[in-house]
C-alpha cells in the first residue's frame, strides 16, 4: 500500500461549456412556487452599484453574537421601479406537455422610452386582446408579466431599457393571477411590492469578464517546478490527455474566463430603502454614479460588474433553517465603498 493521494480534478464540469453568456440580461430558467397569500411578481431586476459595509444587529438566536452589533459587507443594488407594459398567458401544449403562449396583452398607452426597444403598432386594440384572455382563462396554467427596466431613473446614464418576463405567483389560483396582471397594466412595481426585508433571495447575473486566460488562472492548475527538466513550460498542464481520443474536453485548457451567467442561492436581503442619498458616498459610487431612488441592500457579494443588471427571485431551494423573518436592524451604513 502506497501513499494515498487525494487530488480532485481541476475545475467543475457542472458549468461547461465555459463560454461567454448569450445575453448580458440574465435568463431565468426556473421559478419557485411560493405561497404569499396574495398575487405578486416572483422576481425583480436592479442594477449593481457597488459595495459598502454596514453595522447590523445579529438576530440569529443560535449565534454567540446574538443581539450584538456586527459588521457585514453589503452590496447596493439600484432598484428603480419596473414598468409593466403587458402580460402573457400560457397553457400546456397537448402534443408535448410544454407551456405555450396563447394570449398577450399590452398596455394601451406606452411611455416614450419603450420605443427604443419595441416597435409599437399604430392601432392597439386592448379589448380584442382581453377577449382572447377570457377565451383561454379556464385552460391557462401560467401568467407572466412583461416588464421593462427604467435606467433613466438610475445612476447609469443610459436610456435604453431591458425587457424581462417575470411570472406572477403567490397564490395557487390562476384566475387571481390573471386579474392581478390586468390591474398592473401600465403601472410600475417597486421592490417593496415583491420582497420583504430579512428574506432570502436568489441572485442571477452575468459575471465579470476576464477574457482569454491560461489554465493556471482558469482552473487553478499547479505551477510546475522551474528547473531544466520542465523546459516546455511551467504555467501549463503536464499532459493534455492520451494519444486517442484526440481531444479530452475534461482536461484543463486555456480559453474564455468570466462573463458567464451564474446563480447564487439564498442571499439575505437586509434592507429596502426609498432614498438612495442615504447610502451614496459623497463622490458617488466609483464607476457607477449616484443612486437616486429606491435601493436594495444584499448581504455579501453579488456576481457581475458595476452597472450590470441583476435579477432577484424568491428562493427555489430555501434552507431548512431559514433566518428570522423579522426585518434586520441595520444600525449604520458606511459612506465609503469597498
From Swiss-Prot:
InterPro entries (UniProt xref): L3_arc_euk, Ribosomal_L3_dom_3_arc_sf, Ribosomal_uL3, Ribosomal_uL3_arc, Ribosomal_uL3_CS, Transl_B-barrel_sf
Gene Ontology terms: cellular component: cytosolic large ribosomal subunit
GO molecular function: RNA binding; rRNA binding; structural constituent of ribosome
Gene3D superfamilies in UniProt: 3.30.1430.10, Ribosomal protein L3, domain 3 (4.10.960.10), Translation factors (2.40.30.10)
Region (Disordered): 230-258
Domain of life: Archaea
GO terms classed as biological process: translation
Entry keyword set: Ribonucleoprotein, Ribosomal protein, RNA-binding, rRNA-binding
Pfam family membership, one: Ribosomal_L3
PANTHER family on file: 60S RIBOSOMAL PROTEIN L3-RELATED, LARGE RIBOSOMAL SUBUNIT PROTEIN UL3
HAMAP family: Ribosomal_uL3_A (MF_01325_A)
Family per record: Belongs to the universal ribosomal protein uL3 family.
Function text: One of the primary rRNA binding proteins, it binds directly near the 3'-end of the 23S rRNA, where it nucleates assembly of the 50S subunit.
NCBIfam families: L3_arch, PRK04231.1
Quaternary structure annotation from Swiss-Prot or TrEMBL: Part of the 50S ribosomal subunit. Forms a cluster with proteins L14 and L24e.
Protein name: Large ribosomal subunit protein uL3
UniProt organism field: Pyrobaculum aerophilum (strain ATCC 51768 / DSM 7523 / JCM 9630 / CIP 104966 / NBRC 100827 / IM2)
Amino acid at each position: 500500500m502506497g501513499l494515498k493521494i487525494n487530488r480532485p480534478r481541476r475545475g467543475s464540469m457542472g458549468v461547461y461549456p465555459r463560454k461567454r453568456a448569450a445575453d448580458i440580461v440574465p435568463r431565468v430558467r426556473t421559478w419557485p412556487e411560493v405561497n404569499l397569500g396574495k398575487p405578486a411578481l416572483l422576481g425583480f431586476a436592479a442594477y449593481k452599484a457597488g459595495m459598502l459595509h454596514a453595522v447590523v444587529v445579529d438576530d440569529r438566536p443560535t449565534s454567540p453574537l446574538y443581539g450584538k452589533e456586527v459588521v457585514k459587507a453589503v452590496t447596493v443594488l439600484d432598484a428603480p421601479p419596473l414598468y409593466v407594459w403587458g402580460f402573457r398567458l400560457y397553457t400546456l401544449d397537448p402534443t408535448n406537455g410544454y407551456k405555450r403562449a396563447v394570449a398577450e396583452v399590452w398596455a394601451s398607452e406606452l411611455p416614450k422610452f419603450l420605443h427604443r426597444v419595441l416597435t409599437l403598432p399604430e392601432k392597439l386594440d386592448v379589448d380584442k386582446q382581453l377577449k382572447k384572455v377570457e377565451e383561454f382563462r379556464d385552460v391557462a396554467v401560467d401568467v407572466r408579466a412583461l416588464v421593462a427596466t427604467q435606467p433613466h431613473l438610475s445612476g447609469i446614464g443610459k436610456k435604453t431599457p431591458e425587457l424581462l418576463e417575470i411570472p406572477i405567483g403567490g397564490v395557487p389560483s390562476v384566475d387571481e393571477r390573471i386579474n392581478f396582471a390586468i390591474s398592473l397594466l401600465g403601472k410600475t412595481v417597486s421592490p417593496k411590492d415583491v420582497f420583504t426585508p430579512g428574506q432570502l433571495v436568489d441572485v442571477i447575473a452575468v459575471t465579470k469578464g476576464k477574457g482569454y486566460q491560461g489554465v493556471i488562472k482558469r482552473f487553478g492548475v499547479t505551477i510546475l517546478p522551474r528547473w531544466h527538466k520542465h523546459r516546455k513550460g511551467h504555467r501549463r498542464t503536464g499532459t493534455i490527455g492520451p494519444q486517442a481520443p484526440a481531444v479530452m474536453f475534461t482536461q484543463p485548457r486555456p480559453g474564455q474566463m468570466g462573463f458567464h451567467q451564474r446563480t447564487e442561492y439564498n442571499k439575505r436581503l437586509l434592507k429596502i430603502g426609498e432614498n438612495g442619498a442615504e447610502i451614496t458616498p459623497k463622490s458617488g459610487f466609483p464607476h457607477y454614479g449616484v443612486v437616486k431612488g429606491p435601493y436594495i441592500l444584499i448581504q455579501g457579494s453579488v456576481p457581475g460588474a458595476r452597472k450590470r443588471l441583476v435579477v432577484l427571485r424568491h428562493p427555489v431551494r430555501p434552507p431548512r433553517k431559514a433566518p428570522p423573518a423579522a426585518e434586520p436592524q441595520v444600525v449604520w451604513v458606511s459612506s465609503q465603498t469597498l
